[in-house]
Amino acid sequence: MESTDKLTDTNAILAYLYETFPLCFIAEGETKPLKIGLFQDLAERLADDSKVSKTQLRVALRRYTSSWRYLKGVKAGAKRIDLDGNECAELEQEHIDHAILTLKESQDKAKAKRQALAPKKPAKKVAPKRAPAVKKERPAPVAAPVIKLVPAKLEDLKQKQRVNVKLGATPVPGVVTDINKEDVLVQLDSGLSIKVRAEHILL
């Protein structure tokens, strides 16, 4: 019996959209501009789906269209697509200009935030010379191990194995439930099952 629990995590909702409308919502690589008014089409198509609410859909759609990956895809020559991936409209220049400006502002904010969080070097003070003091040796701090996720190979995967699925910029944890040739079925921790290729799985 399929779970009817509502999805509340935005990443899980995006994963659901990637699975349900793969020709419209692109999980990896270059995206395509979405049709104007697509939210209404999306709400109507999922009207009987108890997993998602209109509010959560709107939040997920806003995150998708605000991502750097999406904004880079709003460019000259690109065409808008509908839920089924059909081209339906030309991009207007003002929308391209707006995407370029929004991308630059977002990148500038991210750069400023990184600089603000970076440790600042204190100004050097000229102190009077004193007799050298005996320094007490302090143990060097032990750095926390860095866990680096790497793409999996099909032969390394097995059922019931804990993995991370690469969906957009954020890996989503889940468990391998089935392996069929080159396709791997993974049940995400949100309860959603998604079929991906081995190279989209991180270990």
Curated annotation (Swiss-Prot):
Alphabetical keyword list: Chaperone, Cytoplasm, RNA-binding
Record-linked InterPro entries: ProQ, ProQ/FinO, ProQ/FinO_sf, ProQ_C
Predominant location category: cytoplasm
UniProt-recorded Gene Ontology molecular function terms: RNA strand annealing activity; RNA strand-exchange activity
Gene Ontology terms describing biological process: post-transcriptional regulation of gene expression
Localization per record: Cytoplasm
Residues covered by region (Disordered): 111-138
S-S bridge residues: none
Keyword tRNA-binding appears in the UniProt entry: no
GO cellular component labels: cytosol
Family: Belongs to the ProQ family.
Function text: RNA chaperone with significant RNA binding, RNA strand exchange and RNA duplexing activities.
Protein name: RNA chaperone ProQ
Gene giving rise to this polypeptide: proQ
